[in-house]
Amino acid sequence: MFVVSFALSILYYFAAKSNDRTQQFLRGNVSILPKRKGRFGPRERAPAAPLRAMPAERLFFRRGSAIMNVRRGVPRARCRRTPCGGETDPRAARVPKNMDINKYDPKFKLRRRDLLGLTDLTSEEIFELLYAAKAMKKKFRMRENSTLLRGKTVALLFGNASTRTRVSFEMGIRQMSGDYIYLSKDETQLSRGESLKDTAAMLGRYGLSAVVLRSLTETQTHEFASYSDIPVINGITEVSHPLQILSDLFTIWEVKGRLDNLKLAYIGDGNNIANSLIMGCSKVNMDVAIASPHGYSPARSVVERAMQYGDVLITDDIAAAVHDADVVYTDVFISMNEEDDEEKKHILSRYRVTPEVMALAKPDAVFMHCMPVHRGEEVAAEVVDGPQSICYDQAENRLHVNKAALALLVK
């Protein structure tokens, strides 16, 4: 008994002395709990008995289980995944047996009215949107306008600065023979405290056919949709950016010729882009690896849900994430309204994508950035302006994906 107690004391001592990569595993779930706004944080324990503690290189989620890959040949610790709650739409948990988009037979239909997030979409619905975007791009290249929105008017309710989202929607609606009205949140009664319920219910009474929101939080966007009689499209929230990631998947499909059995590595802040990439990539059978500093990793709830569909790697090690990647992706370090966060800038500064980082990926890997780009901060100019960059293709495809969403949602 004394020997056992002494051994446990030694184990506890070295676990406590280990570096920031020390992670705790708990029976039935991972003990890494949110440090900032529901994100994974280091050395934070859930109220349960620990299985073991060890220096870890990365945290790897593989379809329903969590695996800690450790250094120096230490065996991996496995835990069963704990149920993390239901999907907004139960059908979203269904993954088609054939995950090859090139073998999918599109119907060009969606069974839903709104597009609020990738968590809600089934894999088939993602494929439907991507095939519709492909058709829209073909018409665009042939300079053929569509009449799908003739007699329709779409409201763009925006609350912050926008270039790609606003221009792509305005031009897309025009190219589909529709009309739009641009509403700045500050110029509506929402800025003076009018309820979301009243605003959402009222807009449908004026003959609008859909509303694109880029002004509300994730919770407010879902609340708005619950009161609206017309389709609601999430342009962006602090938690998700579904249209951007649909555009990214479409771009990868174009460049790589497939989506399944690829690996995407995201480097930087675990923000709304990272959250949506995890969900979107997992649902099309694409592995995704996220390299973020502790306290800035993606939302835990998103990672747990994505475990139902595919493999997710969460790490603070850039090399581990980028190794053998087909796509390397990053986003701005500082989001809107965070410009004065000097601590965040300092912490993320070593997560810059450089030519040396790109060299760790596959030779034919491509670089992606959702823009705007801050050269010298999150990415070196040689990378974003180099031959591996497909950022402008990515940006153009926002137009075609937005048109696809409108075509399938607006009746």
Summary of predicted features, one role per range:
Residues 9, 29-31, 40-50, 54-55, ...:
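Intrinsic, low-complexity polybasic segments
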Residues 141-143, 147-253, 375:
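Phosphate/diphosphate ligand-binding glycine-rich loop within oxidoreductases
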Residues 99-167, 171:
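Positively charged, low-complexity intrinsically disordered leader regions
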Residues 1-26:
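A hydrophobic, multi-pass inner-membrane permease signature
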Residues 364-365, 371-411:
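Adenosine-phosphate binding glycine-rich loop
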